Amino acid sequence: MLIIETLPLLRQHIRRLRQEGKRIALVPTMGNLHDGHMKLVDEARARADVVVVSIFVNPMQFDRADDLARYPRTLQEDCEKLKKRHVDFVFSPVPSDIYPQGTEGATYVDVPGISTMLEGASRPGHFRGVSTIVSKLFNLVQPDIACFGEKDFQQLALIRKMVADMGYDIEIVGVPIVRAKDGLALSSRNGYLTADQRKIAPGLCKVMNAMAEQLKAKELTTEEIVALAEQELNDKGLRADDIQIRDADTLLELSATSKRAVILVAAWLGQARLIDNKVVELAE
């Protein structure tokens, strides 16, 4: 496994791989890797000749400086995990290589509509930062496929739209959420939880699953389901932040023609903002 830190060296290897006709898979990450990331790597490994994992804590997608500063940087441990998964290249650039003039005046990629709804409404600029760094990585790595986790449901939808709109010839692979035995979705931010908070955290998944059953039963309105979920989260010791039930294919409000719904939940627990989602098939 080769660790690449500079753009010229990355371009040199990508040029060679392209000349050799290799199929390249990209797994973009911000590091602090866990089993959920490893699932992405395994999926990439099964689909391509060469796997490139990027590790870059992207300053453009953080809406708070303190959140950026405390995001865990664990490059050495991450590389050890990736080596065991037979990753070919780790691309770990410094911010000045990605944003030579800083992030304030940098050229950016914005995906209208989807960037400012839902999570985007509560985190201004976040999705613009995501689409910009992913676009940069696509241009640098030139992958045939790229793997993203379904835990970040809106992010995956945003990337699919960006790829379609920009004409990228890249297959986007969504990989199912990896959960702990108690149902908590794996996340780098789970590391912010204390031992006591970790015991409370699975309540988010339990409330979400209850919402799914209520939605299938069709006995309550979506507004009633959301209100009950907010109360239940608060009763369990979490602080409800944003709970939505949307059309899974458009992320718009549910309509009579919606075939699938997605439940999107976000709640605070101590210093950690936990998110999760669940897709529900709607009966005819």
From Swiss-Prot:
Its EC number is 6.3.2.1. ATP binds at residues 30-37, 149-152, 178, 186-189. It is an enzyme of class 6 (ligase). It catalyses: (R)-pantoate + beta-alanine + ATP = (R)-pantothenate + AMP + diphosphate + H(+). Pathway: Cofactor biosynthesis; (R)-pantothenate biosynthesis; (R)-pantothenate from (R)-pantoate and beta-alanine: step 1/1. The active site is at H37. It is found in: Cytoplasm. GO terms for cellular component: cytosol. Beta-alanine binds at Q61. GO terms for biological process: pantothenate biosynthetic process. It comes from the Bacteria. The reaction proceeds by a bi uni uni bi ping pong mechanism. HAMAP family: PanC. Belongs to the pantothenate synthetase family. Catalyzes the condensation of pantoate with beta-alanine in an ATP-dependent reaction via a pantoyl-adenylate intermediate. Homodimer. This is Pantothenate synthetase. It comes from Enterobacter sp. (strain 638).
